[in-house]
Amino acid sequence: TGRPLLMAEHFDADTAWSLVWVNPLEPQANTGGQEAALAARVYQRAGAVDWHGFARQGEHTGTSVGAAASWVATDAIELHASVRAYQHADSIRSTNTGASLSTGNPWQATRLGAGQQILVGGSWTGESQIGLMVEAWHDDTALSDAQWRDWTARNAVLPTWLSRRVPPAAVAGNLAWQGNA
């Protein structure tokens, strides 16, 4: 389904900007795609470089700003990078990191504090039209190494419940919920 929004846009051959108010009638408590937010985006082409910038103010997540650039260095090579800093972000966290079975989905929505997302990458396309893309990224909204270790340990122990006369559907449900990570 779509999202209700109001939008103003301008563009020409080298520049574009947008101002968007998404979910203008939604209450402040809404999260994720239902959050009311005001966002601005700008694009500028300068020779072989595309520059992007944005700012967003969400009712629930607060302020977010970012910038990106893409440079077509040659006919075969393109380099790109982006950075985003945010006041808050919606994410998920497990309320059950142990070996016990859950009676409901342990992966619950949570609001994170300030953080950032960074991406650096490039692509190469040879004359034979075979391409290679390489990217490195950092994302503060991602689960931590400790949370992934808990997730792995929980996945390993959940099948052992099948030998304890636990209904297979309960074990299957818990394993399926692990997919929410």
Positions of PLM-derived features:
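C-terminal structural cap/anchor segments
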Residues: 127-181
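Signature for the C-terminal beta-barrel architecture of outer-membrane proteins
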Residues: 2-138, 143-147
